[in-house]
Design a protein with these regions (language model features):
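N-terminal loops that bind phosphate or other acidic moieties
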Residues: 1-320
Length: 320
């Protein structure tokens, strides 16, 4: 019998939030190896294919098989408290044509393991410090560095997950040069957010409300941090719509990408904007990733999609 083993990682989950990349956990490759070892002990004659799949969280770049990688480099960035951290930038080989050849000169797909920059601390007190004092500016810095390495027709995929920092993504925008510069930059590029966590930024079940579970701050302080982050972020979202060169007449609404939307590397840069589209807001799907960076990057022109679906596509799970 032929068997496909395509597991994700196994990580500690205090308060239901995975501490991806932490010491006690198992990366997807290790999970696949353990499953294969146990399977072979019971059914040694089965043919096993191991295809570990990441979800866009910290360490996802390491799960991409070497034979799928055209180049790999490490970019230094700053964490929420300006600590030096390293993230992987991977350029993927183009997928072979039906004849088995690879097309020359076609646009490239890149993956930036940005979630490693804002990884959630295991210590609630350290997480509280990041929530109170942290910034997402380092994320903007590594995204800018990655975009400088990509071509104008390339797609840059950015892995994001839950974090303790909660500045609404303002640091990202500032590091990219401010609203006008960042909007112009992203309007000319294909930037996709690969979300390991689909939590919204605000709301009763949003990232702000969840700060009391993953940090040591009080509910009252978490509420104030969330109110401030959501308010500032939505001011930027509104201003970004005013700058949209495609807007005609009344200000149009930004499309909301959900877990069920078929948006990805092969889709157009912007979804159609019909009158029925919901308005992008702090309570929209996936906007809480990276401390609210997902919300602002989407307002600036990025698309978003569930991380496991994107990573499965990158490793050609459907063809395995």
């Amino acid at each position: 019998m032929r068997v496909l083993l395509a597991p994700g990682g196994l990580w500690p989950e205090p308060a239901g939030v995975p501490l991806a990349g932490s010491g006690p956990g198992l990366a997807p490759g290790h999970v696949a190896s353990c499953l294969a070892r146990g399977w072979r002990e019971v059914r040694p004659h089965d043919s096993l294919t191991l295809l570990p799949v990441a979800d866009g969280g910290p360490g996802s770049a390491q799960v991409i098989a070497p034979e799928q990688v055209a180049s790999r480099e490490v970019i230094q960035g700053r964490g929420p408290l300006r600590q030096v951290r390293e993230v992987d930038l991977v350029r993927l080989l183009p997928k072979p044509t039906p004849s088995g050849n690879r097309r020359r000169g076609e646009a490239s797909t890149w993956f930036l393991d940005a979630a490693r920059l804002l990884t959630l601390p295991a210590d609630p007190d350290e997480a509280a410090q990041e929530a109170l004092e942290g910034s997402t500016s380092g994320l903007g810095g590594v995204i800018g560095a990655a975009l400088s390495r990509t071509g104008p027709l390339d797609t840059l995929l950015v892995g994001l997950s839950r974090s303790a920092v909660h500045d609404g993504g303002l640091g990202v925008m500032d590091a990219l040069g401010g609203l006008r510069v960042a909007k112009d930059l992203l309007s000319r590029r294909s930037l996709g957010l690969v979300l390991a966590d689909d939590i919204a930024l605000g709301g009763m079940n949003g990232a702000g409300a969840a700060l009391t579970s993953i940090t040591s701050i009080s509910p009252e302080l978490a509420q104030e941090l969330d109110r401030r982050a959501c308010s500032r972020a939505m001011e930027v979202v509104s201003a970004a719509q005013d700058l949209d060169p495609g807007a005609v007449g009344p200000r149009r609404s930004l499309p909301v990408v959900s877990a069920l939307d078929d948006v990805g590397p092969s889709a157009s840069e912007h979804a159609p904007n019909s009158a029925g589209n919901a308005r992008l807001s702090a309570s929209s799907w996936g906007t809480g990733a990276g401390g609210g960076s997902a919300l602002l990057l989407r307002a600036l022109g990025a698309w978003a999609r569930p991380g496991a679906r994107v990573m499965a596509e990158l490793v050609s799970l459907s063809d395995a």
